[in-house]
Amino acid sequence: MIEVKKLVKRFGLKTVLHGLDFEVRQGEFVVLLGPNGAGKTTFLRILASLSRPTFGEVRVAGYRLPANASAVRSWLGVVTHLPLLYGDLTAEENLRFYGRLYGVTNPSSRVTEVLEMVGLASRRRDLVRTYSRGMQQRLAIGRAILHDPEVMLFDEPHTGLDQDACDMLDTLLRDVAGLGRTVVMTSHDLTRVEGLATRFDVLSRGTISASIRREDLGKNDLLGFYREALAG
């Protein structure tokens, strides 16, 4: 579903990604771990066709990027750590707007379905600026799944949320993954993501330094694996 080979990304004289290789099969839930500045967001932006690679090959759903960016976007749902919603519109109006943008068939019915899925049906006619941070993030996920994408990209979705909002978000993330979607998520909160993903990759010094499946963690918890990967 996602295949990356020898990816290099430079900003001027600074190289952020150094020949990175990465592959995700359909239905996998992969969390990219790494310290601040490791290049996680840069990498996700390239997968989302929001940034161009300097060198290397990137394919999503068989389409090569950035040449087929418009085709790939129909396969993708993207959620950043900032919800980026229209605060002076209602939740329903936000989703209807994006439904038209995505060319969603029968948008009214789909908007209702998505609002119920993210637990906001009772607040559908409230202005989004009156929502809590957690509610806005749930609506952002609703927007991302509106066109029923095969691949979901989440960039630090727990950032700025309180404990209750994080718990609700985790439930929603499991629901999204349970529908068979391929998920790639960045995070630095190891405790929060340990029970979510099927695989954990560590991005360090611009490349994937280690990878492990959840069932292979064994007695070594995720924190121990992460520390060893950074020290290696």
Specify the residue positions occupied by each region the protein language model found.
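H-loop/switch region of ABC-family ATPase nucleotide-binding domains
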Residues: 187-188
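Conserved ABC transporter NBD signature motif
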Residues: 56-67, 72, 210
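Conserved ABC ATPase "signature" region
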Residues: 96, 100-123
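Catalytic Walker B motif of ABC-type/P-loop ATPase nucleotide-binding domains
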Residues: 152-155
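Helix-to-loop junction immediately C-terminal to a conserved catalytic motif
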Residues: 48
